């Protein structure tokens, strides 16, 4: 029930946001003209000042009305929505942004209903006549209705909200709104709050004071920045490694969605966000800060651009204060959180990492059909921030894997096509994505920057390509079966138990020498393995490392081979102190013969119990049976 309610709220909020988002540049243009040409602006100009009022009183409401109508019924809905909005605009003396958000969709729904009723009932040759006159007549009727009803109603609502806001401000209660705003943002309602609520309120407020505090309540990047920096210094696991880059993206790029997964993995961190938001709003109220228009995206650069003359100090102090409060409180919670790592006598499991580990992803991927994937869409609420970054990461990995037949796009959830092959969304947005594209395959993730997720997805796509290639025709199947005995197969000689190494370089040397000893590679291949490790760690997570040579070392490979080495005391392979490998698998690949063997080993290592047994077994036969998934 709660999920359904949340989904309904998200859908409604998304609709409101979609009316505002396409017109953000108009808000910015209006704000910049305010900052330049108004009497308190940088270049006051009475002549050019006349351009400002028509934009806020006519242009913006009409565009919002058109956008709202077109969301319901295309261009016809947009046209009748614009006509209906004219009735709202002329009925009052205040900017009718809220009125346009009602009248536009009303016009769209009306024309959509009318078109459905007359479908297939208009005689040939009269379609254009009926379409044009029906839209004009219905538009006039709706404009009159909105003039006498919607306009006065919105004027009363605006007066009521204005009075309520004055009461809140007079009792200094505005900072308490963070208790609602910050948790709502985590559930991807940030665009709804900013563009559906605060933008209309801010514009009405800015007409009186030339700036408004409401433009900086949701868009303040300080609380999110403080949380991410705290993760960078005191966090554990994979998220701490990506938090530094995420902080830069959030602060300068204005993509607040990037810190949401950090809170979802540790819900207690919502407290620092609330405290940071409250402190920022308190400073704004105290120093009378605010912006001249919507700051979108919520970047420090956008905020500075929308800051009116004389308010830079108050706005910067507000952002800085919210950052410090969020950082200090987040650091305290993270530094003294001893539940991040659970240890037993034999095995170390990192909770934070397990939430985003490759094993979980592999298990999830087993239920999907990758045989006809040509288009992958990474989608988020607005289709511009977090999904764009996720798509960029996946696109690069797809290219590196030579999967040139697969294209990767980023898109807003409401714009998803019905026939998309595979759609990737945050787990909190997947239900909405399924509603928009019910016939597509959907995969959920918790963090758009999760490299392990994309690595495992690409691995599955590559495995599928190998499978399709091997099963393309019956003749290929027979040929593959005939050559099966000639391919590399894991045996007891390839399993080396009870090894010890003080560091990963020593471990790679041990594995490499066994590859040389068994005739798989030349001796210089070991140097290539060490060189490859310097480029990027071959640590896979889940106590496994997969060292191998560089592409240039192909000539040093005599034949395809794999060496499975067990290090019961572990060897640190990753950047984190807890990235300990107990199982080190060395690979020498002459061609693609190793892919199926590695795939089988990967499937065998899907279970925690299997990894733990392999890490401490003293029986080569048991290890071989576990790796090949055959009974002893």
Curated annotation (Swiss-Prot):
The chain crosses the membrane at residues 24-45, 50-70, 134-155, 165-185, 273-292, 313-334. InterPro entries: PTrfase/Anion_transptr (IPR016152), PTS_EIIA_type-2_dom (IPR002178), PTS_EIIB-like_sf (IPR036095), PTS_EIIB_2 (IPR013011), PTS_EIIB_2/3 (IPR003501), PTS_EIIB_mannitol (IPR029503), PTS_EIIC (IPR003352), PTS_EIIC_2 (IPR013014). The modification Phosphocysteine is found at residue 380. Its main location: membrane. Keywords: Cell inner membrane, Cell membrane, Kinase, Membrane, Phosphoprotein, Phosphotransferase system, Sugar transport, Transferase, Transmembrane, Transmembrane helix, Transport. It is a multi-pass membrane protein. The record marks 532 as: Stabilizes the transition state in the phosphoryl transfer from HPr to EIIA. Its EC number is 2.7.1.197. GO terms for molecular function: kinase activity; protein-N(PI)-phosphohistidine-mannitol phosphotransferase system transmembrane transporter activity; protein-phosphocysteine-sugar phosphotransferase activity. The modification Phosphohistidine is found at residue 548. CDD domains: PTS_IIA_fru, PTS_IIB_mannitol. Induction: Induced by mannitol. Repressed by MltR. It comes from the Bacteria. Residues 12-341 form the PTS EIIC type-2 domain. The keyword RNA-binding does not apply. Residues 374-469 form the PTS EIIB type-2 domain. It is an enzyme of class 2 (transferase). One of its GO terms (biological process) is phosphoenolpyruvate-dependent sugar phosphotransferase system. Signal peptide: none annotated. It catalyses: D-mannitol(out) + N(pros)-phospho-L-histidyl-[protein] = D-mannitol 1-phosphate(in) + L-histidyl-[protein]. The EIIC type-2 domain forms the PTS system translocation channel and contains the specific substrate-binding site. The PTS EIIB type-2 domain is phosphorylated by phospho-EIIA on a cysteinyl residue. Then, it transfers the phosphoryl group to the sugar substrate concomitantly with the sugar uptake processed by the PTS EIIC type-2 domain. Homodimer. This is PTS system mannitol-specific EIICBA component. The gene is mtlA.
């Amino acid at each position: 029930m709660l999920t359904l309610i949340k989904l309904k709220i998200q859908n409604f909020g998304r609709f409101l946001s979609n009316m505002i988002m396409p017109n953000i540049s108009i808000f910015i243009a209006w704000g910049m003209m305010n900052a330049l040409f108004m009497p308190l602006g940088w270049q006051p100009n009475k002549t050019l000042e006349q351009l400002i009022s028509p934009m806020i009183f006519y242009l913006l409401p009409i565009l919002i009305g058109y956008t709202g109508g077109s969301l319901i019924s295309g261009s016809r809905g947009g046209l009748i929505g614009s006509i209906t909005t004219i009735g709202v605009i002329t009925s009052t003396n205040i900017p009718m942004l809220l009125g346009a958000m009602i009248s536009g969709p009303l016009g769209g729904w009306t024309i959509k209903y009318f078109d459905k009723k007359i479908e297939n009932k208009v005689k040939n040759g009269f379609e254009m006549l009926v379409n044009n006159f029906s839209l004009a007549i219905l538009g006039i009727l709706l404009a009159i209705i909105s003039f006498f009803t919607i306009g006065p109603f919105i004027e009363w609502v605006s007066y009521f909200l204005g009075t309520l806001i004055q009461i809140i401000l007079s009792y200094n209660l505005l900072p308490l709104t963070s208790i609602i705003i910050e948790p709502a943002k985590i559930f991807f309602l940030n665009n709804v709050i900013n563009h559906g609520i605060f933008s209309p309120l801010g514009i009405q407020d800015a007409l009186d004071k030339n700036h408004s505090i409401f433009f900086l309540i949701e868009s303040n990047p300080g609380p999110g920045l403080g949380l991410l920096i705290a993760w960078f210094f005191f966090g554990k696991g994979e998220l701490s490694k990506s938090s530094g880059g995420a902080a830069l993206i959030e602060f300068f790029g204005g993509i607040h969605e990037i810190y949401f997964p950090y809170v979802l993995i540790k819900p207690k961190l919502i407290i620092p966000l609330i405290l940071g938001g409250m402190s920022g709003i308190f400073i704004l109220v105290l120093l009378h800060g605010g912006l001249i228009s919507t700051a979108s995206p919520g970047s420090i650069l956008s905020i500075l651009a929308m800051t009116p003359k004389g308010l830079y100090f108050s706005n910067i102090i507000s952002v800085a204060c919210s950052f410090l409060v969020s950082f200090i409180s987040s650091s305290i919670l993270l530094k003294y959180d001893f539940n991040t790592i659970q240890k037993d006598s034999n095995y170390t499991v990192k909770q934070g990492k397990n939430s985003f580990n490759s094993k979980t992803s592999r298990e999830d991927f087993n239920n999907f059909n990758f045989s006809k994937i040509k288009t992958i869409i990474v989608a988020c609420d607005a289709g511009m921030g977090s999904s764009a970054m996720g798509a960029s990461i996946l696109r690069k990995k797809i290219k590196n894997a030579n999967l040139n037949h697969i294209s990767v796009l980023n898109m807003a959830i409401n714009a998803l096509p019905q026939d998309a092959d595979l759609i990737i969304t945050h787990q909190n947005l997947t239900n909405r994505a399924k509603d928009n594209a019910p016939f597509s395959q959907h995969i959920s993730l918790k963090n758009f920057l999760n490299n392990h997720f994309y690595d495992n997805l690409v691995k599955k796509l590559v495995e599928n390509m190998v499978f399709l290639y091997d099963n393309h025709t019956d003749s290929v199947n027979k040929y593959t079966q005939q050559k099966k005995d000639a391919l590399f197969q894991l045996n007891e000689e390839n399993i080396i138990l009870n090894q010890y190494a003080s560091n990963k370089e020593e471990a790679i040397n041990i594995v490499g020498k066994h590859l040389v000893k068994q005739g798989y590679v030349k001796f210089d291949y070991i140097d290539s393995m060490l060189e490859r490790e310097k480029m990027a760690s071959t640590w896979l997570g889940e106590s496994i490392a997969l060292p191998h040579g560089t592409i240039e070392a192909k000539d040093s490979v005599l034949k395809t081979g794999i060496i499975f080495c067990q290090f019961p005391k572990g060897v640190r392979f990753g950047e984190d102190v807890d990235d300990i490998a107990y199982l080190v698998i060395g690979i020498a690949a002459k061609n693609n013969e190793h892919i199926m063997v590695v795939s089988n080993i990967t499937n065998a290592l899907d279970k925690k119990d299997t990894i733990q047994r392999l890490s401490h077994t003293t029986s080569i036969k048991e290890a071989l049976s576990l790796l090949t998934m055959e009974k002893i």
